[in-house]
Amino acid sequence: MKITLSIVSHGQRDIALRMLEDILRLSPPDVAEIIYTANIPERDLPALNMGHIRLVVIRNETPKGFGSNHNTAFSHCRTPYFCVMNPDLRFDTDPFPALLQDLTGTPKRGLVAPRIYSPEGELANTARKLYTPRELIRQKLHPVNHGDHPDWLAGMFLLFNSRAYNEIRGFDEGYFLYIEDVDICSRLCLAGWSLAQVADTCVVHDARKQSHRSLRFTRWHIGGMLRYWTRTCFWRYGWRLWREGRR
């Protein structure tokens, strides 16, 4: 068993429970442990038939950000691979064999992700080009999934080589809920690792786009963008991609 899963619930206990039931129904042999973080108070999970999978529940006294929660979960990780997952994913098949095949079969592969689909069967644009103001506008007008050569992968499902995650010290906790995925992909690649979206596997994401409805979420999103665009890793990563002819 090779993988530790990290799932963070922001009061999404019932949604997360459906995903946990999907995972336990499939009983993926590669999954050793699930670390479930309740970021805000919620009802206890019911008794679950975990089989070979160990469940660890963390309850935060005060809410933490995306990166902080997953970094805390990683401190419990004793497996060679660490998977960050949103609680609103659904699984029809086990995605991990194909992901591990790419992750273990490619030298210096630090991160992989599956293709992500909406419940209606639409491919989501979760494999993206460098996060610039121009690219952000382009994606809003004409969403495209750059699965062949992505510069970053969206954070709803990220399977890391634990050595890579540890080497770059995980997520930057200076962000809060947004842009942590963009930042960690940039730093991972600058550290000499690579990333990929694996076309042979997929999961469904039943997204709740709160940032489109809440001023508070919008403020966090804009703050994350400004933080990223003013940091050295953004400029270094952009320069590297330009030299490689990918910009």
State the predicted function of each range.
Residues T93-A124:
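Conserved donor NDP-sugar-binding/catalytic core segment of glycosyltransferases
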Residues D22-V31:
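Short, acidic, metal-binding catalytic loop of nucleotide-sugar glycosyltransferases
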Residues F82:
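Short aromatic/hydrophobic "clamp" motif used to bind/position activated sugar donors
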Residues W152-C202:
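A short, conserved alpha-helix in the catalytic core of glycosyltransferases
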Residues L130-D151, G155:
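Short, flexible, basic/aromatic active-site loop/helix in glycosyltransferases
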